[in-house]
Amino acid sequence: MGQSTLIRAKVGDRFSIGDGCPLTLFGGPCVIEGEDFSLKMAESIAKVCDRLGVQFVFKSSFDKANRTSIGSFRGYGLEEGLRILERVKTELGLPVLTDIHESQQAATVAEVVDILQIPAFLCRQTDLLLAAAATGRTVNVKKAQFLAPWDMKNVVNKLRQGGAENLLLTERGSCFGYNALVVDFRSLPLMRELGCPVVFDATHSVQIPGGAGDRSSGQREFVPVLARAAAAVGIDALFMEIHENPDQALSDGPNMIRLADLEATLRQILRVREAVAEPIGASA
């Protein structure tokens, strides 16, 4: 792709992500934990982003369909979850993102959200990708933990063949033996060469899959470390799950950062990003 071609994705009619655009944060609790809590978290995160000049998309899941154990909390379900996300969108004026797990969910979810997210485990599911593409919404695809960054070209081709125009690709760590992930930061420029803005998922990258036996564990203390490294390599957006009290969260608490730590973390990332403000690419 020629260097004169701008790499951007539109988030509805709100803003763009990519070349020449401010950093965007995809942030919020892992799973929807209630209406009032979602509104409170969205408003609090939005205020931090406003102070720092960061574009903000609220994210939260209506269903965590791939929890480690059958007894883990999955969420409020499609209907109630979308109602809560729609309230965040309309009352706070924020764009929203959530993930879909089945093809038949795409059209319904797209009526509410601004960005459809394809989970990493499902990123090669052709029917799911085509259903998401058909909605006309922006699509964020998480690279599978088992997939090479250059193999994401096939995912991008499926979505483009399906009519998707605004695509984002997310790095969230790669399998490193059992119960461990490692981040290969080469994936960011390599995926960006596919013509899509790139996102770094700083919180799932510190996950320890199945590390607590019947649930995943994590090392949230390394979230700022990896986020700064990603900013140095070059990112268009940052994905971070955020909670008022992660130790009491209903899903992925060990990976999530505390709301109280968000502003300081973002300030560090912005300073790094500004210091290395050059085009992102893998070419020498």
UniProtKB/Swiss-Prot annotation:
One Pfam family linked to the record: DAHP_synth_1
GO CC terms: cytoplasm
Keywords: Cytoplasm, Lipopolysaccharide biosynthesis, Transferase
EC number: 2.5.1.55
Pathway this chain belongs to: Carbohydrate biosynthesis; 3-deoxy-D-manno-octulosonate biosynthesis; 3-deoxy-D-manno-octulosonate from D-ribulose 5-phosphate: step 2/3; Bacterial outer membrane biogenesis; lipopolysaccharide biosynthesis
Reactions catalysed: D-arabinose 5-phosphate + phosphoenolpyruvate + H2O = 3-deoxy-alpha-D-manno-2-octulosonate-8-phosphate + phosphate
Localization: Cytoplasm
GO MF terms, alphabetically ordered: 3-deoxy-8-phosphooctulonate synthase activity
GO biological process: one example: keto-3-deoxy-D-manno-octulosonic acid biosynthetic process
Sequence similarity: Belongs to the KdsA family.
The name this protein goes by in its record: 2-dehydro-3-deoxyphosphooctonate aldolase
Name of the gene encoding the protein in the UniProt record: kdsA
